């Protein structure tokens, strides 16, 4: 995000305690499928997204990631979280799908469970890179 932009769904860009660090997570089922969320933003309409988001200043990556996933999916991550890699201000992690039902927030309109060979076309290449490192 550019310095002048504001997130429509949180206080990012309006609240000085928010950072520009973003964490995303590849959450996989025992069957090898992963969760993708359909974004509901003007900037990325109908794009598929990995769960995650902005990490607040003073918040650990893991705590921020757990908070973002709970906000976006209603899932409480109880399994260990492993770092895949970081590039620029974005970090990618992975974990196993916890028990529970997915409940979407206002940030997303839909979700799918998809295998690597069934990836949709409208997903960022950087997300696909992270997914390929896990699956």
Where are these regions (language model features)?
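Acidic, metal-coordinating catalytic segment for phosphate/diphosphate chemistry
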Residues: 1-24
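Surface loops and adjacent helix of pleckstrin homology
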Residues: 38, 107, 124
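A generic fold-level signal
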Residues: 2, 20, 28, 43, ...
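Short histidine/acidic/glycine/proline-rich micro-motifs that form metal-
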Residues: 55-56, 118-120
């Amino acid at each position: 995000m550019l310095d002048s932009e504001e997130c429509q769904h949180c206080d990012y860009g309006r609240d000085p305690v928010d950072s520009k660090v973003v964490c995303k997570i590849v959450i996989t089922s025992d069957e090898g499928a992963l969760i993708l969320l359909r974004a509901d933003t003007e900037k990325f309409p109908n794009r598929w997204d990995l769960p995650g988001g902005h990490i607040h200043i003073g918040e650990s990556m893991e705590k921020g990631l757990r908070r973002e996933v709970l906000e976006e999916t209603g899932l409480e991550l109880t399994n260990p979280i492993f770092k895949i890699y970081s590039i620029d201000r974005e970090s990618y992690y992975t974990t196993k799908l916890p028990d529970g039902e997915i409940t979407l927030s206002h940030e997303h309109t839909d979700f799918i469970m998809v295998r690597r060979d069934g990836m949709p076309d409208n997903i960022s290449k950087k997300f696909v890179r992270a997914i390929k490192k896990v699956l």
